[in-house]
Amino acid sequence: MPIPRQRRRCAGFTILEMSVVLVVIALIIGAVSVGRDVYRSAVAERISTDFVQGWIIAYDRYTSQVGAVPNDSPSNPTGRINGGTGNALCDDDLRDEMLRRGIALPQGRAEGFENRYVYQDANGSPQQLRVCLLNVNDWSEPSTGSSYAPRPRNVMRFEGLTAELAHQIDLRIDGRIDARFGRFREDSRYDDTSPIGSPPADNPWSESEPTPSSYNREENIPTMVGYLKMNR
């Protein structure tokens, strides 16, 4: 008499097994996200240390060796970049003026593009940081009492700042994130002479870092312009 075969029962994944798989996937995604954030933070730190600080050092060496600010007259100095014309000193003009005085430049995007630096934003898209020098007539400085007044100052302009990079540089230079006060300011806030409220209001940069859970990675991350007040 033939013995009937027992059919093996086909069973799917149990709830516990599926839960374990989902947890593992979530951990992998989280690790990748954290790794990406750590990498961008390290890149921003490198930009602050090598590129931004490198240009500050180059500027200070220029003024120390020449006895005047860039593209000003050493024999009849005005104390203002480009002689106070209001025009920015950028790109080839900036590079040539520095090299003509024997000033070593920081490594930038490439040879001949030392005033530019390419980096990736939170979307992985390329952004370009660009440095120029100029004189402004309306840098806000403390005046009598609790008022503020516009003063002429030489500044270094940084174009192409994402919120993440602007915050990193602001923290490194001023020790806090503040778009209005300190040496490093946003171009739309540097000349604000309105009185401080009580209690003082926060002064965030106009763009904030994107929220990972809500922003669209297909969108372009906006950039800003920052002004750094020079020592001379």
Q: Would you name each region that the model predicts?
A:
Residues 6-7, 49, 53, 72-77:
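Short, flexible helix-coil linker/hinge segments at the edges of structured domains or between repeats
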Residues 218-232:
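Short, low-complexity, Pro/Ser/Thr/Gly-rich segments in the mature regions of secreted, periplasmic
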Residues 62-99:
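Short, glycine/small-hydrophobic-rich surface segments
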Residues 47, 51, 86-90, 157, ...:
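Extracytoplasmic/periplasmic, Sec-exported soluble proteins
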Residues 2, 7-40:
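N-terminal single-pass transmembrane signal-anchor helix
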Residues 92-222:
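Intrinsically disordered, low-complexity regions enriched in Pro/Ser/Thr/Gly and acidic residues
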Residues 37-70:
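Membrane-proximal N-terminal amphipathic helix
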